[in-house]
Amino acid sequence: MNVMDAVLPLTIRDAARARILLRSLARHFEGLGTLWLVCPATELPAIEREIAPVSDGLNVVLLPESELVPELRHTPWLKGWYRQQLVKLAIHERVRSELYLTLDADVICVKRASPSAIAPLGLAPCHTVERDIHADWYRSAQAVLGLEAPRKGISHNVTPALLHRRAVAELAAHLELRAHNGAFARGLRGISQRLVAAAAGTRCWRLLLAAGAPFTEYALYYTFLEATGRFGQYHFHSGSSLYDDEGSFWRADARDFSGWSPTPALRGDGAPWFVVVQSNTGVSPAEVEAKMQGCVSHV
């Protein structure tokens, strides 16, 4: 695989963080295809202005959320996190590469990366840990899918990750069939799905998910693949994530950031290729940029 598309859901609030990400991709990611930047329609002009100075060398396509997921107009209460997850799945209908990279604005590419290095033999790496970190994610996935997860007490990697567009299409087809057959979830989740479907006058997989929140994209995706025996067609079990879990900054106390350094993540070749400085920590984009320095400057 020589070229790999990527998707970045974005709001204007995180545009400054996205500028750091885009500069890091331009420097380090060889073979990046189209970067699908999906944002609220009302924010698109402002976001376009914000990213224009750092888009050289990147094939950025801005796409309104409402064009990719028109069903969102029926669920105006859906929070941004769930909207972004839906975007990461729905983009499979637009991407041109078999595998595509999911991104958030707080991700930074810190090493030379390429599609062939990240996905040897065209299969996407998937890292799991033997810890039940987010049991609620998997309970929600089983409820929405109507499937039983074959493995319990595990957690799959999160963003940045690689998804296979055919695998996502098969997940969408499964959800579409459930929506068409009225196979809604039990309890309040199912009541919401029924009411929204009736009000919208339509049933489709995107609406089923939007009305059936809470959900998480990776728990849905990997649970579906494992429960239906499809995992090995598209993924292999990897000893590490695309991102440096220990070297990323996840903590919610911004005061701890003074002691954080990206240096360990820069050593060596190969995985992990990314770090995350989570936006909800309160660390400003300027502080992140100062820490990263040469990692995000143009060569």
Predicted features and spans:
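Short, acidic, metal-binding catalytic loop of nucleotide-sugar glycosyltransferases
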Residues: 24-32
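Catalytic core and acceptor-binding pocket of nucleotide-sugar-dependent glycosyltransferases
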Residues: 156-260
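Short aromatic/hydrophobic "clamp" motif used to bind/position activated sugar donors
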Residues: 100
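Conserved donor-nucleotide/metal-binding helix-loop-beta segment in metal-dependent transferases, i.e.
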Residues: 110-145
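N-proximal low-complexity "stem/linker" segments adjacent to membrane-targeting elements
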Residues: 1-23
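Active-site-proximal specificity loops/subdomain of glycosyltransferases
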Residues: 47-93
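Short beta-strand/loop segment that forms part of the nucleotide-sugar
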Residues: 33-43, 63-65
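The conserved acidic donor/metal-binding loop of glycosyltransferases
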Residues: 104-108
